[in-house]
Amino acid sequence: PQACKVAQSIETHVDAFAPGGYGQKHGHMNSAVFFVLKGRGHDIHDGRKIPWEAGDALIVENACVHQHLSDDPDDETIVLIMKAKPLFLFMHMIFQKMVEFPPKEPAPGQEDYAPPASL
């Protein structure tokens, strides 16, 4: 890890949404970049709708209240998310707020959905 110092300040994860699924509405101090690997949908950033599809990259600005939503009724959506969150944690700038929790029930017709095992 001596050669990977820059990676210590970047957090990366993959989100998978069932067809028609969506994540929680939330905000955090750190910015984020996400790359759409599969699917199509839109984000809401501070009330503004931003459509996206596979191959697109989006930036979530610092302190932006946002939500990711899949618009594909037939196929899952997969996004790669990258954040400088470890750096913000180190600086004690850890404010993160859930504005609206994700649904507890799956989207209609997606009761048996499971994220791909290959992720």
Where are the predicted features?
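A generic structural signal for short, solvent-exposed coil/turn residues
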Residues: C4-S9, F35, I44, V60, ...
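Double-stranded beta-helix
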Residues: Q67-L119
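A short beta-strand-loop-beta hairpin characteristic of the jelly-roll/cupin
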Residues: G27-A54, C64
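Conserved metal-binding segment of the jelly-roll/cupin
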Residues: F17-A18, H45, W52-D72, M82-K85
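A short glycine-rich, His/Asp/Glu-containing loop-to-beta-strand
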Residues: P1-K25, S31
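A generic membrane alpha-helix/interface feature
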Residues: K38, I44, D56, I94-Q96, ...
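Residue-level detection of beta-strand scaffold positions
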Residues: I10, W52, D75-T77
